[in-house]
Amino acid sequence: MAARTGNDPATDVRTTILTAAESCFERFGITKTTMEDVARAADMSRATVYRYFSDRESLIIESVARRARLNMTPARAFIAKWPTIEERLVEGICQNVESGLRDPMVHLLVSPSEMTLANSLLTTSGKAVELTSELWEPILREAQEAGDIRADIDLTLLCEWISELEIMCISQLNGGTGSLERFREKIRTFLIPSLLPAGD
């Protein structure tokens, strides 16, 4: 069988739809965007859009996931620069918050008008925790195996907590309350000591 060349057409169509959806979200707002709006922006029929995405909610979730995964490699490289797990957690979480604040899609999701929908989608779908685990679980597992964090910590639960902390901080900073430096200090003061082995 001949080797396949070029891009996967299905992937190209999905990307086109997602790009169109994101432009509609920015133009109309997430809750007011319809599948018809997306189809029109993508220059496709609604039937084609529905063939790839069952509803607007699945579009939102995949958009968030796509953008997060594009940031995964640079995020890992940034975290790896720090010599200790304490610094990796503090600086890595703060960097993720900063990236979220710069991302127009995340910026929309955590705005007051969209926050209820965002919380429902990302929490109910488990996507926020899944994405946080993709980034953090290998780093945390390595630290746990090296004895740098407690052996009894449930890493899945810890990733869930990190996800919630990041979403909360992005929401607060996006709303004009709090500061990243104060958030950094809270992580250093409360999160880090809870993870370290006794005696550290």
Segments from the language model and where they lie:
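Basic, helix-initiating cap at the start of DNA-binding domains
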Residues: 1-28, 32-44, 58
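C-terminal peripheral helix-coil segments that are non-catalytic and often amphipathic
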Residues: 1-4, 95-98, 133-146, 163-165, ...
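Short hydrophobic/aromatic patch on the recognition helix
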Residues: 42-53
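DNA major-groove recognition helix of helix-turn-helix
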Residues: 53, 64, 166
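Alpha-helical DNA-contacting segments of helix-turn-helix folds
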Residues: 59-67
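Hydrophobic alpha-helical connector segments
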Residues: 62, 73-105, 158-162, 184
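Amphipathic alpha-helical segments used for helix-helix packing
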Residues: 100-123
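Amphipathic alpha-helical packing segments from all-alpha helical-bundle domains
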Residues: 119-148, 156-160
